[in-house]
A protein has these predicted regions:
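S-adenosyl-L-methionine
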Residues: 1-43, 51-58, 82
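SAM-dependent methyltransferase catalytic-core segment centered on the flexible catalytic loop
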Residues: 240-304
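Class I S-adenosyl-L-methionine
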Residues: 319-323, 329-362
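Conserved Class I SAM-dependent methyltransferase catalytic core
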Residues: 278-330, 337-338
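SAM cofactor-binding core of SAM-dependent methyltransferases
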Residues: 41-112, 125-132, 148-151, 155, ...
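Conserved proline-anchored active-site loop of SAM-dependent methyltransferases
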Residues: 30, 42-56, 65-72, 227-247, ...
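SAM-dependent nucleic-acid methyltransferase catalytic core
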Residues: 7, 115-249, 264-277
């Protein structure tokens, strides 16, 4: 049955995030819905911010975090796989200062006036290079986990300084325009990058703990994961919300963070025809034509596991369609709903309620 954890403890312990679609706020409800299920090993197939994986880790489960994005994979290493490595004061000091290296100026040149101020772009080029150059101080697993903590902290700082916490358009003017604002956190936008980074380095290190299990972080396409056995599969996949034609493309929304993860080859992978300089698009694995077949493929591959799906209603495919797909492999399918409004989702104004849904199939 696992450990009993209070709602207050869950809310206070889970790492903060500025990632769109994070289940952090829903975690107490997810915990209450799943805590009586009989499982020990769990795969979080679309790990994202790591909130639900971290919850499972708190519950004492053996957790495998998986996400296809390299930036999210770093969070999985830092907070799920990592049981003891932290960033110490001398590490952070090394990361935020120039250390005599021949620093690149890639972000300063390519992303001028797009996402950050000039001095912030200089800072980013220095800190990113320093994170990679932690290899001068560490090696092996210690290096891997210290770099992951640093990248995780950097990504949180980067998101904090972005309007909507995204990289979907060239909108630096929203920070710099001298206008009355009804939204946005101007105080955070005006906070120096290094202050935000130091704060998130400390927070990330404070969140490192051991649940005495060998937890793992992967960076795989879940559609290709076959033959792996877990007691429970948790899915928070891309899906099509009401009135949308396509599921959210997280690689496009967070392309800047993905670019950082391939910093020294980033220049070769940019679509220079677009004003906001995103990465050249990959073939989409999740679209309106493939989404139903993708669900069926995953349910088939993991039919021996308890399958738990975080979903939205209204959405496409519908909850009823998902339920019918699951009945091809499972005898019992339970639906739980909770009314919820996302910050950037205003559909409730026209009388249409949105629900967070948990589909539990055994």
């Amino acid at each position: 049955m696992g450990l009993e954890i209070s709602e207050e403890k869950i809310k206070s312990i889970l790492p903060s995030t500025r990632y769109q679609g994070s289940k952090r706020k829903m975690s107490p409800w997810i915990y209450e819905s799943l805590r009586k299920l009989d499982f020990d090993t769990v795969l979080d197939g679309f790990g994202g911010t790591g909130s639900v994986s971290y919850l499972f880790k708190m519950m004492g489960k053996k957790v495998t975090f998986n996400d296809i994005l390299l930036s999210n994979y770093q969070t999985g290493i830092a907070l799920i796989e990592n049981n003891k490595i932290e960033l110490h004061g001398d590490d952070v000091n090394y990361l935020i200062h120039e250390n005599g290296f021949d620093y690149p100026s890639f972000i300063q040149k390519i992303f001028k006036d797009i996402y950050y101020l000039d001095n912030e772009n200089v800072w980013l080029d220095i800190v990113i290079h320093n994170i990679y150059m932690l290899s001068e101080k560490y090696e092996g697993d210690v290096l891997r986990k210290k770099q992951a903590l640093a990248f995780h902290a950097l990504f949180q700082a980067c998101l904090s300084k972005r309007p909507y916490n995204l990289f979907h358009r060239r909108n630096l003017y929203m920070r710099t325009a001298n206008v009355q604002r009804k939204f946005g956190n101007k105080k955070t936008w005006d906070t120096p990058f290094d202050a935000l980074f130091v704060k998130f380095c400390k927070e990330a290190s404070d969140k490192v703990f051991s649940n005495k299990r060998r937890n793992i972080a992967n960076c795989k396409n879940i559609l290709e994961m076959k033959g792996e056995r877990y007691d429970l599969l948790y899915l928070d996949p891309p899906y099509i919300r009401s009135k949308q034609d396509m599921p959210a493309d997280y690689r496009s929304l967070y392309h800047f963070l993905e670019g950082i993860m391939d910093y020294y080859h980033w220049e070769e992978k940019i679509d220079y025809t677009k004003k906001n300089k995103p990465l050249i698009k990959n073939k989409r694995l999740w679209d309106k034509d493939s989404i139903e077949a993708n669900f069926d493929n995953i349910f088939n591959n993991f039919q021996d596991s308890i399958i738990v799906l975080s979903y939205g209603d209204p959405g496409y495919p519908s909850v009823e369609t998902i339920k019918e797909l699951l009945y091809s492999y499972k005898n019992k399918v339970k639906i739980k709903k909770k009314e919820y409004t996302y910050k950037l989702n205003h559909s409730g104004k026209n009388g249409t309620k949105s629900y967070e849904v948990l589909i539990i199939a055994q």
